[in-house]
């Protein structure tokens, strides 16, 4: 597997210790090319903020994480260019457009989206997503 789409449920695990954080870090050790929609920056920032509110991380750690994500993701994709395909997936799957942006990007790149989002895993077309817990290089 040479290209992966990473969603926010995986990216947050690079910065906050959660279940399967070790697996998420393995993606970074011998990384394939990592892709993400620009939307990931916002979702990651929101997830980091929630963890700050729970006193699990500091404001400094939030700043470090938001600064480092640009170096971690190899290819950023404009969310707007994925919107039409994401909307179609959203209607077909009866699922939030936010998540379908990641699926649309995976489809466009003929790649796989790695996620820890159980609901997304349950509704996504086969072969388009892989559970973080099941990901292997």
Predicted regions and their residues:
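A general alpha-helix detector
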Residues: 43-48, 68, 85-86
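Short, well-structured N-terminal submotif of metal-dependent ribonuclease cores
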Residues: 1-40, 51-64, 119, 136-137
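Active-site neighborhoods of divalent-metal-dependent phosphate/nucleic-acid chemistry enzymes
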Residues: 71-116
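Phosphate- and divalent-cation-binding pockets in alpha/beta enzyme and binding domains
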Residues: 23, 43, 85, 122-123
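Structured helix-beta-strand junction loops
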Residues: 30-31, 72, 109, 126
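Acidic, PIN/NYN-like endoribonuclease modules and their adjacent C-terminal/linker elements
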Residues: 1-3, 95, 103-137
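Short glycine/serine- and small hydrophobic-enriched flexible loop segments
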Residues: 46-53, 107-108
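Short, conserved alpha-helical segments within structured domains
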Residues: 40-41, 61, 65, 82-85, ...
